[in-house]
Amino acid sequence: MNQSTIPLRLLYKGVLFLLVLPFLLQAQVTTDRYQGYGKLILADFKHSMFPHHERYEGHRFQDTLFFHPDTHYSDRSVAVFIPTGFKPTKRIDFVVYLHGWYNYLDSVLLRYRLIEQFAASQKNAILVVPQGPKMAPDSHAGKLEEPFGLQNMLSEALIVLKKNKIIRRGSIGNIILSGHSGAFRGIALMLEKSSLRRKIREVYLFDGLYSRQDKYTKWLSRYRGRFVTVYTTDGAAEKSTEAMFPMLREKQIQFCNTNDFDVTLDDLRRERVLFIYAPIPHDEVVYCIDQFLNLLRTSSLKNSVSPKK
């Protein structure tokens, strides 16, 4: 996130978070909370986002606040969710979700209802949510910014699935990348550099197109994937989102810009490149209107159950 575009609201939020930080850092993901939706596995990955050499000495934000590496960049946790009805196949499809600033894994899963929405989509895929910068104003994606970062993490996810007897064998299939706010940086760099970029079929950004529009445009031009971004005026991403429009026109990439109140499931299925303006708060854009669920429902992922006639 460009520091010059950071709204004061987010800075105030960061100060409040720092006041309760000691309590939040002790929070643990409660896996049995989601038993009704499937199986949630929380594991420490060797190939997690962090620790990473660019944050070994921590992170200083705007030359004022310092975020210590032991507190904010040492958590190797990765949540792997297997929905009820999942059927193992030769190639395992993944949906990877990256969180934004000032967050931690349990809060991400609970507040944004990721597991509930993912399970309701009835797609035959695995949800992977890695811990990013923990309770820090930082868009760095750690190892996922490296060419083999995504491949290593998903390969390790396959090992976790095998150890838990979810699958007997399998390789990495199609991939959907999604994320909120500061996740834009990690997703953009994976589209540009990842060894798995040919397998990335779709991208969902929730109020996060703050910069690197050129990388998203280049990916759309080269790989013709599906790209949907939901943006608001609340998170300071409106102008930077609309700055991508002329880039798409220059590459002769057709796109649709619409209002959330007007968009239908048919629109989501039909439009390959879609910008959706949503007049809702920045921090509610993922879950308030079940947009994550609707995007998954209309995705190219196979269903885990036969759709009702």
What is the predicted role of each segment?
Residues 14-22:
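Bacterial N-terminal signal peptides
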Residues 27-93, 256-261, 304-308:
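A domain-start/cap signature at the N-terminus of enzymes
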Residues 91-94, 98-158:
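Active-site machinery of serine-nucleophile hydrolases
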Residues 94-98, 126-130, 174-178, 202-206, ...:
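Structural recognition of the beta-strand scaffold that forms the well-ordered cores
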Residues 142-182:
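Gly/Ser-rich "nucleophile elbow"/oxyanion-hole loop immediately N-terminal to the catalytic nucleophile
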Residues 173-216, 221-222:
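Primarily recognizes the serine-hydrolase "nucleophile elbow" in alpha/beta-hydrolase
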Residues 230-309:
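C-terminal catalytic histidine-bearing segment of alpha/beta-hydrolase fold enzymes
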